[in-house]
């Protein structure tokens, strides 16, 4: 059994949030020990077929800067200027995310990011133990047992407090639930996802535009591709669980090939291993997790996906989890006892987590159904015009969430007002030539206060 040190925290999960928090706290003098169920990815390779590629936004970059990790991470990232929309008929069209190349997002492969953060966490002084699956927790005695699944051997520790950064299927959350119910609810989409890959050209380089997030929207389903720094694309098909087409009717590589030939014909030649990868990679579930509370006084706390997992359609799950890490480190600085710090952290983050969960669900409908809709495209044009005229007041939803660090709850509230303005102003119009700009100015100034950070 290991003795407990002063100002020590024990973390469950050495994924992205766990490693970033370990860096932040180790550099502030905390003694951090991390226990990870899987093996060391630097030795055994990364678990395949489970992770959607990650979109790094300003929130995530800010957190990396606080941890001194931004330079290392950005060397592995690829810029994405916007959505490259591939219609079933016609040429792809780029829909920019922002006004110029200062307003972009960055694609990074989960494995590369995890390895970089693991290295930095250990360099900062954190101790990371692999092949340690959380089995039993006695929160009153401060005792935990882990199992090494390679040989079924138990490993026992004493702890001061546990931080759960072990993802949507959190073992710590399950242990907390057994101690005191957390009010856990998970709502799964009736869609799942399958991850595939576009390889680089034989001589290296991307087979399609490398600085974009590619989308093939097809109504009830869609296919996306995010670039990696080695010239590959991580590609993901989102498909209903039932109906036609669906995972129920696309059961093997041959049926997947037929689906792509019919609905994604320009993508099919890009994925030479489609049949093989389809059968090797299991479908992933998509769900939204909510809890009534995230902590047990000062004994345990959940962060990131363990507390508020979301669907991936706004590219904010990692960015939100990284914000959690900075917020928790700040609350630990501000409070003398863990119970107060954990309560303050939850109070500060709960509304924002709920807001981005809602916006992620809404963004799925936009990506799947609306990116090639004429009404939506006209509203996008007006949105850009309103931002150009009144940039501190009419700040596009995507800008607030992705390029600024506007609180998610504020971004949600303002986005709902702005959506109403766009819908009302474009109703009955096929272009912007006949809009009443004076009336729009009055509406914008009456309904939208200047936003901090907008320019």
Swiss-Prot record:
Biological process per Gene Ontology, one example term: quinolinate biosynthetic process
EC numbers, comma separated: 1.14.13.9
Pfam families referenced in this protein's UniProt entry, alphabetically: FAD_binding_3
Any GO molecular function: FAD binding
Entry keywords, A to Z: FAD, Flavoprotein, Monooxygenase, NADP, Oxidoreductase, Pyridine nucleotide biosynthesis
Catalytic activity from the UniProt record: L-kynurenine + NADPH + O2 + H(+) = 3-hydroxy-L-kynurenine + NADP(+) + H2O
Cofactor: FAD
Pathway: Cofactor biosynthesis; NAD(+) biosynthesis; quinolinate from L-kynurenine: step 1/3
Role description: Catalyzes the hydroxylation of L-kynurenine (L-Kyn) to form 3-hydroxy-L-kynurenine (L-3OHKyn). Required for synthesis of quinolinic acid.
Protein family according to the UniProt entry: Belongs to the aromatic-ring hydroxylase family. KMO subfamily.
Protein name as catalogued: Kynurenine 3-monooxygenase
Organism listed in the record: Xanthomonas oryzae pv. oryzae (strain PXO99A)
